[in-house]
Amino acid sequence: MKFLHIGLMTLMAGVSNVLAQEEANAEDVMVNIEGQDMTMEEAEAYMAAKEKMGGAQQQREMINLQVNYDLLEEPFADLQDFIVFEVGETATLNYTIHNLDQEETYSIVGVSGAVLSEVDQRNVANLTETNITEIVLAPNATGTLRHKIDMNLTEGRYYILPLLHVKDKNEVKRVMSNTFKLDLINQSISIFDPSFLSIIAVLIALVGGTVYLYSNVVAPPKKIKKKEAIPAKIDESWLPDVHKK
C-alpha cells in the first residue's frame, strides 16, 4: 500500500511538471496573424485591438489597399520589435499606401488611432483625430502620408493602433494598419539642458554661500600672537669716551 501511494505521488508530480513545461513553451511560440509574427500574448492583444476598433480590420479587407509604414525617426528599426522612444518625443509614421483595386478609387481623408497597454490590453489613450488634405488613389496608384504621434504617456510598453480614414464612394471607413509596438522610457538629462544647468548654478551658489558664511561668521577669527620686540645691541666701541654711557 505504501509503495502504491508513493507511485501515485510520483506520477502526479510528473504530470504537473509536463503541464508546467508545456505552459512555459506556449509563451515562446510565435504565431503569424495577418502577416505579423507575434507571441501568443501579443496575438491576444492584437485580436483585442481589432475588437476595440469596431471592425476596422474587416474594413481593410473590404477596401483593397496595401498599407505599409516605417518610422521617420528610426528608419532602420525592426517594426516586429518594440521601438524605444522617450516620454515627450514624437514618432512619425511614414506611410506608403497602394491601391490594389483595378476599378475603385479611394481617398485618404484623415488619421486617428488608439493606444493599448501591453499589460492588460486596456485602451489607455486615443490618437488625435486629424483631417488631412485629401489624397486620391486611383486604381493601382500609390500615395504617401506622414502621421505624427506625440508620446505624451507615462513610462511603459504600449501597442499603437494607427487608423486611416478612407473614403469609399460617399462613405468614410476606418482602416487599421499594422500595430506599432512602443517601449516608452523617461527622458535622459543632457548636461547642456537649461534646467540641468540652472540646478548646477543653484548648487554652486549654495556651496559658495555656505563657505563664505562659515569663514566670516561662524568660524572665530584666529588671534595673531604679537612677537616681543628684542632691543638692538649697539656697538659703542668707536664712540669717544665722553659719549659712552
Swiss-Prot record:
Signal peptide (from-to): 1-20
Membrane topology, record value: Single-pass type I membrane protein
InterPro entries in UniProt: TRAP_alpha
Domain of life of the organism encoding this protein: Eukaryota
Parts of the chain on the Cytoplasmic side: 210-245
Segments traversing the membrane: 189-209
Keyword S-adenosyl-L-methionine listed: no
Principal subcellular localization: endoplasmic reticulum
Residue spans, topological domain Lumenal: 21-188
GO cellular component terms given for this protein: endoplasmic reticulum membrane
Family: Belongs to the IRC22 family.
Protein name: Increased recombination centers protein 22
